[in-house]
Amino acid sequence: MMNTRALLPLSVLLMATLCLCELPIPILQRFVRSVPEECPIADPSDFKFSITSNRNKTGHWTAQVRLEHGEHEQSGSNQHNRDLWQVDLEQTTTTCAGVKSVQIITTITAPPPTAAPSIPPGYELSAVLGYYKFHKTPKTWDEARIICQQEGGHLVIINSEDESKVLQNLFSKVTKTEGATNNDYIFIGIHDRFVEGEFITIFGKPLATTGFTRWVDSIQPDNAGGNENCGSMHPNGGLNDIPCPWKLPFVCEVEL
């Protein structure tokens, strides 16, 4: 399960001017919350920002910056990744008419918001996993892969037993597909076209990295006839190797 969206970054400019005069060592704290509600972003994250400015033992002014922000949930593989926020700080000390002042200018650049994917008609949402569409019209493995790409998704890759069960449920709703070479299998996004027996995903990742390697039985994959180079799934959720030119139903996936 898996991609990039380009939106302008969000910049927040904070300026604080500290007037020294005869006051004690100044401490500036600012707490900035998320961008205004009217900003159309898909996943706003609260953040907390603070600056502490003081004079050290040598008489120099220093500023300490602290930034805390929320966690973004990235699409592509159901993994939580912390986006990088950039903090730039400039501090200057000036004297005007005998009065010293410290000026701190801080720019916080937040990552661009992630837009929600556009889901084509016919896809069903499975919570946490993604969107799936069962194509009943039989196609070859290559035709199925292209159709999924045209819909903005990809030929499904099974990453867990839970995902296998989702596909089993979709498969169970179709008893027979007219024109299919075999009604016991559906195409999925793995193959061993490059090296026999070494199955990889349509993205070039080894099958072992998907998190799901359960074959339909202990015999598979057997490369029967010497030309079974494309992946399929049995109604029991197990994997099998199938000739790529066969025409089978298939499932497309759009990741969360």
Swiss-Prot record:
Expression sites (tissue/organ): Hemolymph.
Position of the signal peptide: 1-21
Keywords: Calcium, Disulfide bond, Glycoprotein, Lectin, Secreted, Signal
Cysteine disulfide partners in this protein: C148-C252, C230-C244
Record-level Gene Ontology MF annotations: carbohydrate binding
Domain of life: Eukaryota
Glycosylation sites: N56
Sequence ranges assigned to domain C-type lectin in this UniProt record: 146-256
Major site of localization recorded for this protein: secreted
InterPro entries: C-type_lectin-like (IPR001304), C-type_lectin-like/link_sf (IPR016186), C-type_lectin/snaclec_domain (IPR050111), C-type_lectin_CS (IPR018378), CTDL_fold (IPR016187)
Induction per the UniProt record: By introduction of foreign cells into the abdominal cavity of adult P.americana.
CDD domains, alphabetized: CLECT
Location of the protein in the cell: Secreted
UniProt GO cellular component terms: extracellular region
Extra facts: Calcium is required for lipopolysaccharide binding.
Protein name: Hemolymph lipopolysaccharide-binding protein
